[in-house]
Swiss-Prot record:
Transmembrane segments: none
Post-translational modification: Contains 8 disulfide bonds.
Protein name (Swiss-Prot/TrEMBL): Cysteine-rich venom protein tropirin
Record function comment: Blocks contraction of smooth muscle elicited by high potassium-induced depolarization, but does not block caffeine-stimulated contraction. May target voltage-gated calcium channels on smooth muscle.
Superkingdom, taxonomy of origin: Eukaryota
Cellular-component GO terms for this entry: extracellular region
The entry's keywords: Calcium channel impairing toxin, Disulfide bond, Ion channel impairing toxin, Neurotoxin, Secreted, Toxin
Main location as per UniProt: secreted
Species for this entry: Tropidechis carinatus (Australian rough-scaled snake)
Protein's cellular compartments: Secreted
Organ and tissue specificity: Expressed by the venom gland.
Gene Ontology MF terms in the entry: calcium channel regulator activity; toxin activity
Family: Belongs to the CRISP family.
Length: 27
């Protein structure tokens, strides 16, 4: 993805889990 959810993407890689954030578009 990109933009504001860059932190969430990093967390996904560390936890090996996919997390969805509301209001943010994940590419």
């Amino acid at each position: 993805g990109g933009g504001k959810d860059y932190r969430v993407e990093i967390v996904d890689k560390h936890n090996x889990l996919r997390r969805s954030v509301x209001x943010t578009a994940r590419n």
